[in-house]
């Protein structure tokens, strides 16, 4: 949808579309008509109908949708929220994992923690059970 074609809707207009025959969602100030997607939604149609006509941004992000799901949303976008009713909540991005950092930290923890535990156990045993010969 190009910017000159973008329709705008109010929250009140979106709220009218809250049934399984007419299901609109507001996500990140964008309006999506997901009626045709209800039966295809991997999480079931109930979760979409429950959010129909409402701002579903938080619930959408809490689920942690994949990049494929985010790309798929584009075809259901029918417009945007009017400027005066938009929220300034920044879109959460997918977490970026640094495998290099995790691997380095994990390898240190994987041998350091058991080493310290063995040392503590050895000292405990020697102190309490080894005892000094008298």
UniProtKB/Swiss-Prot annotation:
<dbReference type="GO" id="GO:0043231">
    <property type="term" value="C:intracellular membrane-bounded organelle"/>
</dbReference>
<keyword id="KW-0812">Transmembrane</keyword>
<feature type="domain" description="Cytochrome b5 heme-binding">
    <location>
        <begin position="6"/>
        <end position="82"/>
    </location>
</feature>
<dbReference type="InterPro" id="IPR036400">
    <property type="entry name" value="Cyt_B5-like_heme/steroid_sf"/>
</dbReference>
<comment type="similarity">
    <text>Belongs to the cytochrome b5 family.</text>
</comment>
<keyword id="KW-0492">Microsome</keyword>
<dbReference type="InterPro" id="IPR018506">
    <property type="entry name" value="Cyt_B5_heme-BS"/>
</dbReference>
<keyword id="KW-0249">Electron transport</keyword>
<dbReference type="GO" id="GO:0006805">
    <property type="term" value="P:xenobiotic metabolic process"/>
</dbReference>
<feature type="compositionally biased region" description="Polar residues">
    <location>
        <begin position="87"/>
        <end position="105"/>
    </location>
</feature>
<dbReference type="GO" id="GO:0012505">
    <property type="term" value="C:endomembrane system"/>
</dbReference>
<keyword id="KW-0479">Metal-binding</keyword>
<keyword id="KW-1133">Transmembrane helix</keyword>
<dbReference type="GO" id="GO:0020037">
    <property type="term" value="F:heme binding"/>
</dbReference>
<keyword id="KW-0472">Membrane</keyword>
<keyword id="KW-0349">Heme</keyword>
<feature type="binding site" description="axial binding residue">
    <location>
        <position position="41"/>
    </location>
    <ligand>
        <name>heme</name>
    </ligand>
</feature>
<dbReference type="GO" id="GO:0005789">
    <property type="term" value="C:endoplasmic reticulum membrane"/>
</dbReference>
<comment type="function">
    <text>Cytochrome b5 is a membrane-bound hemoprotein which functions as an electron carrier for several membrane-bound oxygenases.</text>
</comment>
<dbReference type="InterPro" id="IPR050668">
    <property type="entry name" value="Cytochrome_b5"/>
</dbReference>
<feature type="transmembrane region" description="Helical">
    <location>
        <begin position="111"/>
        <end position="131"/>
    </location>
</feature>
<dbReference type="GO" id="GO:0046872">
    <property type="term" value="F:metal ion binding"/>
</dbReference>
<dbReference type="GO" id="GO:0006979">
    <property type="term" value="P:response to oxidative stress"/>
</dbReference>
<dbReference type="Pfam" id="PF00173">
    <property type="entry name" value="Cyt-b5"/>
</dbReference>
<protein>
    <recommendedName>
        <fullName>Cytochrome b5</fullName>
    </recommendedName>
</protein>
<feature type="binding site" description="axial binding residue">
    <location>
        <position position="65"/>
    </location>
    <ligand>
        <name>heme</name>
    </ligand>
</feature>
<feature type="region of interest" description="Disordered">
    <location>
        <begin position="86"/>
        <end position="105"/>
    </location>
</feature>
<keyword id="KW-0813">Transport</keyword>
<keyword id="KW-0408">Iron</keyword>
<keyword id="KW-0256">Endoplasmic reticulum</keyword>
<dbReference type="InterPro" id="IPR001199">
    <property type="entry name" value="Cyt_B5-like_heme/steroid-bd"/>
</dbReference>
<dbReference type="GO" id="GO:0016020">
    <property type="term" value="C:membrane"/>
</dbReference>
